[in-house]
Amino acid sequence: MAARRSLRYSGNPGAKHSKNTLRSTYSRKQKAGPKPRPKDVFDFSNNSDASSIPGALEEEEETYETFDPPLHSTAIYAEDELSKHCVSSSSLATHRGKASRNLDPSEDEASGNESIKVSTKKPRRKLEPISGESDSSADDVRRRVASAEGPRSQQRQAAPAAPSPPERPAEPVTPRRTRLHSAQLSPVDETPATQSQLKTQKKVRPSPGRRKRPRRGHTDTDGSESMHIWCLEGKRQSDITELDVILSVFEKTFLEYKQRVESESCNQAINKFYFKMKGELIRMLKEAQMLKALKMKNTKIIANMEKKRQRLIEVQDELIRLEPQLKQLQTKYDDLKERKSSLKKSKHFLSNLKQLCQDYSNVQEKGPKGTGKYDSSSLPALLFKARSILGAENHLRTINYQLGKLLELD
């Protein structure tokens, strides 16, 4: 803790002065009266070492002290001044809030290395060591920082690696700068702002993304272990397709390959690829089954249509063959119809004629007997009676004619 520190300021690199000139310039600046406070301010606390800086009693009364950087690029100061500067910078950092916590550790270390460097030159004057009270306070602060960083490191180790790294959560001030500041703090300088900062460091928890993503990966691994294996044993050989064989072989290959992979991120990527590929194959299988069913229905419909078409052709041929028969039957029907009508008419005529004869006979029986007289009106009746006589005469003539021919031949 007794080592010397040096602050580097941007000055004119061409100007060169001796160390004695620098020290005399610095003593004149210290003895000068108070000036308006510039941007670069060193706030000296009450616990600073009085022997390291002349006129300590006068400086305690002054609230601020001006400081003009020398022309030389570096200047040597006591460790007490450096501690006071660190205390003021830490109080400013607490007022800034989250902006100082989001800094990258590499950037903080680089800025710390540029602003604060250990001086390797020979000391010009002796410095008194820091009191034991400041050492004890520094140890307490270190212990608090270590206790705040312990659970964070354990939580980071316990969280499994996600496929895509989540956003980096807001980190507190880097350990190196914190140790440097806390080593110089005293019990009086430990403000409520620093205490609240330490409490917030203890209460920091990993972001929600880090807590949710490992659970999702865990469920994926559990789901992959309890996944459904595509089985071909219960199917008939005619129902098994190329996609069924590909899917079963793909699942077996996936399980064998997954047992050989140890990386969690690789397992998650393999699981995603497997589930997407399996879903695509199952979708293709369902579409193939639907296509097969539609083809079977289509073939059945086509077969029924062919049967009906063949039957239609047969009926047309039969109709063509039976058409002349239909015409013949139609003519026969017409003839029979005419005969039926003629028979009805003849029957009606005969019935009327019979009735007439009956009436005539009845009249003759009732009337007086006398010679019959025939006139022209009775000609039809005479012809009807002579019909039998004329028929016998014609019959005798035919017999006579035939006998004459036979005699001529003899």
Swiss-Prot record:
Post-translational modification: Phosphorylated by PLK1 at Thr-74, creating a self-tethering site that specifically interacts with the polo-box domain of PLK1.
Keywords from the named record: Centromere, Chromosome, Coiled coil, Cytoplasm, Kinetochore, Nucleus, Phosphoprotein, Repressor, Transcription, Transcription regulation
Ranges in coiled-coil conformation: 291-352
Key word Transcription present: yes
Domain of life: Eukaryota
Tissues where the protein occurs: Testis, spleen, heart, kidney, liver, lung, brain and CFU-E erythroid precursor cells.
Composition-biased stretches (Low complexity): 151-161
Biased composition (Basic residues): 16-36, 200-216
Residue numbers of Phosphoserine PTMs: 106, 111, 115, 131, 134, 136, 182, 186, 224
Keyword field contains Transcription regulation: yes
Chain residue ranges for the region called Disordered: 1-72, 84-225
Pfam families registered for this protein in UniProt: CENP-U
Principal location class: cytoplasm
Localization: Cytoplasm; Nucleus; Chromosome, Centromere, Kinetochore
Motif (Nuclear localization signal): 4-21, 295-312
GO biological process terms on file: chordate embryonic development; chromosome segregation
In-chain residues carrying the UniProt-annotated modification Phosphothreonine: 74, 191
CC per GO annotation: centriolar satellite; cytoplasm; inner kinetochore; nucleoplasm; nucleus
General function of this protein: Component of the CENPA-NAC (nucleosome-associated) complex, a complex that plays a central role in assembly of kinetochore proteins, mitotic progression and chromosome segregation. The CENPA-NAC complex recruits the CENPA-CAD (nucleosome distal) complex and may be involved in incorporation of newly synthesized CENPA into centromeres. Plays an important role in the correct PLK1 localization to the mitotic kinetochores. A scaffold protein responsible for the initial recruitment and maintenance of the kinetochore PLK1 population until its degradation. Involved in transcriptional repression.
Complex formation: Component of the CENPA-NAC complex, at least composed of CENPA, CENPC, CENPH, CENPM, CENPN, CENPT and CENPU. The CENPA-NAC complex interacts with the CENPA-CAD complex, composed of CENPI, CENPK, CENPL, CENPO, CENPP, CENPQ, CENPR and CENPS. Interacts with MLF1.
Protein family (similarity comment): Belongs to the CENP-U/AME1 family.
Protein's name according to its UniProt entry: Centromere protein U
Annotated source species: Mus musculus (Mouse)
Underlying gene: Cenpu
